[in-house]
């Protein structure tokens, strides 16, 4: 975010998901910055998809915030970006069905994310993955730690 006077409660968050095999063992990672404070965390699921991990990264990042904040979420996931900024209102209006009248994939995670986003003032920022953005690179590394934490050898 490039405002001259950012809000005092501004949290910047970089999120990423990873999956080895799709489906397969997956992980999510979050880098969070609040002023001079930084926090990183990750998790994993032994049998999941990349898209589920991308959504879960944002859910877990927002869940970690104890009070309402202004949050800038940096993600390299077009799926998450478009889901939250374009598709969500239509899914909700149609009772969680797509335009083709099929159930929305990962609806339970989208509903969790929608509830978490409602607690905050959220701004979405897309970043190109694996392109040198330090926050995105850290989130990617954390997501891969999440994979490693659940992967079977």
Swiss-Prot record:
Its EC number is 3.1.26.4. This is Ribonuclease H. Its main location: cytoplasm. It is an enzyme of class 3 (hydrolase). Its cofactor is Mg(2+). It is found in: Cytoplasm. One of its GO terms (biological process) is DNA replication, removal of RNA primer. Monomer. GO terms for cellular component: cytoplasm. One of its GO terms (molecular function) is magnesium ion binding. Keywords: Cytoplasm, Endonuclease, Hydrolase, Magnesium, Metal-binding, Nuclease. Belongs to the RNase H family. Binds 1 Mg(2+) ion per subunit. May bind a second metal ion at a regulatory site, or after substrate binding. Mg(2+) 1 binds at residues 16, 54, 76. It catalyses: Endonucleolytic cleavage to 5'-phosphomonoester.
């Amino acid at each position: 975010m490039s405002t001259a006077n950012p809000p005092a409660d501004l949290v910047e968050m970089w999120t990423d998901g990873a999956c080895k095999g799709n489906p397969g063992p997956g992980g999510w990672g979050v880098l969070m910055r609040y002023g001079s404070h930084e926090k990183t965390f990750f998790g994993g699921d032994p049998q999941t998809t990349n898209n589920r991990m991308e959504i879960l990264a944002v859910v877990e990042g927002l869940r970690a915030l104890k009070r309402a904040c202004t949050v800038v979420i940096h993600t390299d996931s077009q799926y998450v970006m478009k889901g939250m900024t374009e598709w969500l209102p239509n899914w909700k209006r149609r009772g969680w069905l797509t335009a083709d009248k099929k159930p929305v994939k990962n609806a339970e995670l989208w509903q969790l994310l929608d509830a978490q986003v409602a607690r905050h003032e959220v701004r979405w920022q897309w970043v190109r993955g694996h392109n040198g953005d330090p926050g995105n690179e850290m989130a990617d590394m954390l997501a891969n730690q999440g994979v490693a934490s659940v992967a079977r050898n």
